[in-house]
């Protein structure tokens, strides 16, 4: 008998137990541990879903879904049925969450397995012990989990299927709206409007650099009070008056407060915090992070161990850690760093109130597998992410950092200055890992030895002008944080949501920042005007809470959908009436480019595939052009201009303008510098230790990239 794993033929063997998982990689890892009496195959995700061509939900009959077998899974379903028929028992071992439970439920339906049969097994980690634990506790399918997934799927289908045609009629075909994506775009649009409407306010500070008798090094101090009131100067005139008061005054230390401050480690990762930290520290987008995490969970080939999952399940909002993992971490910390780095008792981190605590936090499954031990077995992305996860988890179980802090009050007449400094008394967990922040603020360094009553010399006294700053644009990291803090979406939705709003061109990246496009602003304004509840963060969070109640068995999924649909249907009817005969225009961006066909200005438009140049004389003139980003470099093969482009996955690369006749392309950046040997364009290799080289055939010129920096100094 032929069995099928992700389209790959497998050898025939007598089946006793069949285990079905989602992915081929996971199947391969699990089969290694289960032995010859088990065959493990993959469903490759969902095999049944709502139809693509119609709503597929009977809104008048308790929202009954009309599921269909997926057409592209027909051959696989046939193989799964054959395998299931030949097996003594079938286990459904899809992922341990709502989506995984729903996949198992659909598999049971298609394969004729009773939903009351104890065939459902789950693995929080793909290791020998994790698989053994899961296989020893089979259970029936959890209909509360399944109904929570069904409610979310059906609600999202209703919103998307009903709203999208409205947007097509009123704006442009091919647009979409969604329960989570529309709120995410609104957050970005609202932030952009805050930035645009922000009016900077001028203010001034007075800063001193002071010298003590015991030190040559000046230390900084800041004016905080004048005549017993907080110092606040809004212009240069006010600042100059205070500076005049300070001129020739004596700076005397009036108080010194020494204390010890504890700094505690960050908890181990949840899905959200992993995506945020990978964005900040590794410059990974959410999709890239989750791809690498999925691979680490499902299993990688480790020398002398074979395939093994080296992190726990990566879709979680829990901070819980098993006692076994804590004990293993404690042993590793003591043996590697010393007993002083081990706290007196293991740390316990409290999960947020709405966390689903079925899983642990994200952690390494085998603590002794340090990043360096597995580096040779992992891809670059896998290694970087595993190192981040391993170090964060280990640090979370280490002793606090201790800081000796010093706060100094310095008076000059009726003015009070303050200076703050610290020294590290004990490095603690920071020996291994420190959490990054979106906006790091530098703390003061060490202060010299000082005494109360000591007179200080003034090395420098300046008034400095400042302006209040608008709120920053969202990055992927800060957007994920905002979504989580507002209760919008679940751990599994952050990455696909961000990918969707970028792919739909509602949002674009500028460096690491997320900026709304004119299309995104138009759609958001339209949604706010006619579907306020759909783009309201509080309403969306309430829907997530309702799904959680369904999962907990505290709410009926049909009632939840009914309550939503009644209000939504009224909104849609009213919007169609209010917008009858009206269309919304997407504003064009003006350019200095002249149409080569009619002489009118070209403008930047947004189409289904992104931005392009179109003639402002449309529809009389239909001239369009691609937006070309020239680099200043020339192709080493044909001499054409090198253009900056993006792959289908959004990764930047460089290609020749004569791409139809010349196939030269590279990930490496073309420079304006010319090769000193042959005069061709030079390229800089990707990476921190990159080289500058000439790509001209037969030239061979190369130099270290850091030579450029040396020559600048």
Q: Each predicted region: which residue ranges?
A:
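Intrinsically disordered, low-complexity regulatory segments
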Residues: 1-150, 162, 236, 240, ...
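Basic, low-complexity terminal or inter-domain segments flanking catalytic cores
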Residues: 2-17, 29, 38, 164, ...
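Conserved short loop/turn motifs at secondary-structure junctions
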Residues: 15, 95-96, 172-176, 258-267, ...
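Alpha-helical scaffold elements adjacent to nucleotide-binding pockets in ATP/GTP-utilizing enzyme cores
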Residues: 29-33, 79, 102-110, 130-134, ...
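C-terminal or mid-to-C-terminal helical accessory/interaction module adjacent to the motor/catalytic core
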Residues: 126-208, 258-259
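Core structural elements
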Residues: 152-162, 180, 210, 261-273, ...
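Metal- or metallocofactor-binding catalytic centers and their adjacent structured scaffolds
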Residues: 230-267, 454
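Short acidic, hydrophobic short linear motifs in intrinsically disordered regions
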Residues: 253-256, 265-278, 305-314, 470-482
């Amino acid at each position: 008998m032929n069995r099928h794993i992700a389209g790959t033929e497998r050898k025939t063997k007598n089946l006793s137990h069949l285990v079905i998982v989602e992915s081929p990689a996971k199947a391969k890892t699990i089969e290694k541990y289960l032995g010859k009496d088990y065959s493990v195959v993959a469903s490759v995700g969902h095999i049944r879903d709502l139809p693509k061509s119609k709503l597929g939900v009977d809104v008048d009959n308790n929202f009954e879904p009309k599921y269909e077998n997926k057409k592209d899974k027909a051959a696989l379903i046939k193989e799964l049925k054959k395998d299931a028929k030949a097996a003594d028992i079938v286990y459904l071992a899809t992922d341990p969450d709502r989506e995984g439970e729903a996949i198992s439920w659909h598999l049971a339906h298609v394969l004729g397995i009773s939903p009351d049969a104890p065939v459902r097994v789950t693995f929080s980690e793909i290791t020998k012990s994790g698989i053994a634990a899961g296989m020893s506790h089979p259970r029936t399918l959890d209909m509360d989990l399944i109904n929570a997934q069904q409610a979310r799927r059906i609600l999202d289908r209703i919103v998307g299927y009903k709203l999208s045609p409205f947007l097509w009629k009123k704006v442009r075909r091919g647009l979409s709206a969604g329960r989570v994506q529309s709120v995410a775009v609104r957050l970005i649009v609202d932030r952009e409007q805050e930035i645009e409407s922000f009016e900077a306010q001028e203010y001034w500070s007075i800063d001193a650099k002071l010298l003590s008798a015991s030190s040559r090094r000046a230390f900084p101090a800041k004016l905080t009070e004048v005549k017993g009131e907080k110092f606040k100067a809004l212009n240069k005139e006010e600042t100059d008056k205070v500076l005049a008061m300070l001129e020739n005054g004596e700076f005397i230390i009036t108080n010194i407060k020494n204390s010890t401050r504890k700094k505690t480690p960050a908890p181990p990762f949840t899905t959200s915090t992993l995506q945020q930290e990978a964005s900040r520290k590794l410059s990974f987008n959410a999709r890239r992070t989750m791809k690498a995490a999925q691979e680490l969970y499902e299993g990688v080939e480790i020398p002398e161990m074979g395939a093994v999952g080296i992190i726990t399940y990566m879709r979680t909002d829990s901070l819980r850690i098993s006692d076994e993992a804590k004990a293993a971490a404690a042993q590793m910390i003591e043996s590697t760093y010393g007993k002083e780095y081990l706290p007196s008792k293991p740390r316990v981190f409290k999960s947020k109130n709405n966390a689903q605590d079925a899983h642990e936090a994200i952690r390494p499954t085998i603590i002794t597998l340090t990043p360096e031990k597995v580096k040779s077995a992992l891809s670059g992305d896998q290694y970087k992410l595993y190192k981040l996860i391993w170090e964060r988890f280990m640090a979370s179980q280490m002793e606090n950092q201790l800081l000796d802090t010093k706060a100094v009050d310095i008076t000059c007449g009726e003015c009070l200055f303050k200076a703050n400094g610290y020294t590290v008394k004990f490095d603690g967990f920071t020996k291994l890992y420190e959490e990054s922040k979106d906006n790091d603020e530098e703390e003061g360094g060490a202060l010299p030895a000082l005494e109360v009553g000591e007179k200080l010399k003034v090395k420098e006294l300046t008034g400095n002008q400042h302006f209040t700053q608008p709120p920053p644009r969202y990055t992927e990291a800060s957007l994920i944080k905002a979504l989580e803090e507002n209760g919008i979406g679940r751990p599994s939705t952050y990455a696909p949501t961000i990918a969707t709003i970028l792919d739909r061109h509602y949002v674009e990246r500028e460096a690491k920042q997320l900026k709304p496009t004119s299309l995104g602003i138009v759609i958001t304004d339209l949604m706010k005007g006619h579907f306020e509840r759909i783009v309201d963060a509080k309403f969306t969070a309430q829907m997530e809470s309702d799904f959680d109640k369904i999962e907990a068995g505290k709410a009926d999924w049909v009632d939840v959908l009914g309550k939503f649909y009644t209000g939504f249907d009224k909104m849609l009817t009213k919007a169609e009436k209010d917008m009858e005969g009206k269309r919304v225009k997407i504003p064009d961006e003006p350019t200095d480019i002249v149409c080569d066909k009619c002489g009118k200005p070209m403008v930047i438009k947004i189409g289904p595939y992104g931005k392009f140049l179109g003639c402002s004389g449309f529809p009389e003139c239909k001239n369009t052009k691609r937006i070309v980003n020239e680099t200043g470099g020339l192709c080493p093969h044909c001499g054409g201009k090198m253009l900056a482009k993006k792959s289908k996955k959004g990764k930047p690369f460089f290609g020749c303008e004569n791409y139809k006749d010349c196939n030269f392309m590279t990930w490496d950046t073309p420079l304006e510098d010319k090769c000193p040997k042959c005069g061709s364009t030079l390229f800089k290799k990707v990476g921190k230790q990159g080289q500058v080289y000439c790509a001209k055939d037969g030239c061979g010129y190369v130099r270290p990239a850091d030579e450029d920096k040396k020559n600048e100094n």
